[in-house]
Amino acid sequence: MKIEQGFVLTRHARDIAGQTQIELWLATPSGPTQLIIRGERPVFFIEQSASQEVIRIAAELSITPSLSPLSLRSFAGHPLAACYCNTIRDSQILAEKLAQADMLILEADIRLADRFLMERFIQGSIEFTGQIIDFGHYRQVQQAKCRQGDYLPALNMVSLDIECSEKGLLYSIGLDSPMDSRVIMVGQPEPAETPIQWVEDEYQLLKALIAWFEQFDPDVIIGWSVVDFDFRLLHKRAEFHKLKLTIGRAQQPSFFRTASQTQQGFISIPGRVVLDGIDTLKTATFHFRSWSLESVSQELLGEGKAIHNVHDRMDEINQMFRHDKPSLAHYNLQDCVLVNKIFAATHLLDFAIQRSRLTGVELDRIGGSVAAFTNLYLPQLHRAGYVAPNLQPENWIASPGGYVMDSIPGLYDSVLVLDFKSLYPSIIRSFLIDPLGLIEGLKLPIGKQADHAVPGFRGGQFHRTKHFLPEMIEKLWAARDEAKRNQEKAFSQAIKIIMNSFYGVLGSSGCRFFDARLASSITMRGHEIMIQTKQLIEARGYQVIYGDTDSTFVALGGQYSQQEADNIGHALVSEINQWWTEHLKQEYALTSILELEYETHYRRFLMPTIRGSETGSKKRYAGLKGDGDNEQLIFKGLESARTDWTPLAQRFQHQLYQLIFHGQDPESYIRTIVEQTLAGQLDEQLVYQKRLRRRLHEYQKNVPPQVRAARMADDINAKLGRPLQYQYRGTIEYVITVNGPEPKEYSKSPIDYQHYIDKQLKPVADAILPFIGKQFDELIAPQLGLF
């Protein structure tokens, strides 16, 4: 039988006629392929001593499990048996009943399709054989046998966007892909530059969408809030018309569900992956001031949508649908094109594919750090003779966070930043920190010999040879270095996120491997390393003014040229790395992977005080680096770097620091900005933009300004018969007026300029002016008298 290659798009398991069926949809060089695997039995693990009780309880439920004693043990050391059932339903019912009877059941939450792939080390890429039936549009493989593969797919992608009325009636659906680009529009045919497929009504619109998917058959669907908005509404309208949305492969219907607590939507479409632009960018650690399509496309591409305000947009869409459908089609398709351009510019599809190849998580998985770790770790753990523990819901001890040193405030010349390269991953590798290593290490005495354990913190100790995590990180580290050399940005970013998430997973009570001894052995070792490194630097005559997690800020004590600073930086890291290598070898008989790097030389650097005190602040600083065309002003944690400060404060801070860092007098600039603010010349810079982190009705006692503005906006929306915007979180833009906060789109009262002087300009100025002997209030006193 010929062995073929493919890439897993979707996975699903269900019960059919008394046995299970796993359905995997793949992208292959020969087109879409459906693998059918029958008869895989769901399994969970029980203590061998409970076998008879399990059989008794199963009999009461008319379930006949198969129990197999194993050589595997729990982390507590108890011998285990595997409990197999014929169907997923039987397995779930039995596991639930045993849990109610307070019996230990392990790994009952691992889904059948996930376990099937995981235990075969299948991570995205797959090799398969079986009986192939060709259905033209796709192939089906019966009695499929699978193993790990190494195949990089070329997936075809469509960008989808809908336009609708404020009541949620569909007007049109835009689809943009290399295969076909069109808008399906309700209405009578009329000439248009945009390719339009005209349909009679909403029902025919949905039928045309189903036919489009059947004809052009994309692997991936992308969009902006495409799950929570577009697909939610498409399903709602299909339900209204009693129509199954059969947009899956093999004419299978898509399935939409809403999480009960968060109201977040989830969609599954057999054979097709749905990637939401916002969620995928967040998973790939992108940050934007606003997540609107307009804002992100302006920032990334320098182009955006034609209509900005949400209500203007709604009114204009309604107008276009009634009187100018060709313009609506152009607008609809433009959104699809923008999303395609954003995905191309950020390599998001490549990122999702590489993440799946590295960890085995689904292409459309949001976040997924715990799932990634479980996928990689569980099969190795089984082969080492253990079954994974369950989540520990209570009684867990929080581990200390990263090291943050008290800063020494001041305005400095020549500050170096020295960074430990991937500090937490390198601690895991150097000190052999690992869940299995902890269980095995606790059986040994602590010491330097080969048969002794490596000491950790809070009672943790680690086996010198029985571990997986250090090797997992070593492989990822090497892959990332290669990706960097090959300039594969998406691959490098995917590896970095996964590697850094491993500490977060071990330190999260949402992970089955969470143990305070693991997390603390990483963070507390980090504290120790940072404190010792500070002492080593200060012993060489330099002043450490701040330290944060893995970065150390070193004041050289005067003005140094770039070359002089570089020489000092390189010498320092070389000496300190050598010290750590010798220290780990002598104290622990370990090989150090710790690597301090010389990161940056700031020609001028400000470490501010905490507002209203003389104490140095944390995670807040600014610096000037480079010169000429390469000069850069960097802000961390200050107003310029925070999205909840107004553009006025951000621009003021940027220019003020620019002047002071270059030794220029800022007095005239400060007075001018205050004058312009009071004269109403900078009103467009006074808009606050803040996220509502809860539902509007949940704000009871403390009602911040953004909530007051949001409530006012939705009260007005209700009176005007417009949809409410802010009930379920969201982002609000508002201004402070003499009558308090008002939403930007409905603001009527005069602006409270004094508020902006006191709350936006003054805090920015007060952070830096005292270091050059000036006071904001004294500088602006004459201006205030004029107004």
Predicted regions and their residues:
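Catalytic P-loop NTP-binding/switch module of NTPases
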Residues: A479-R485
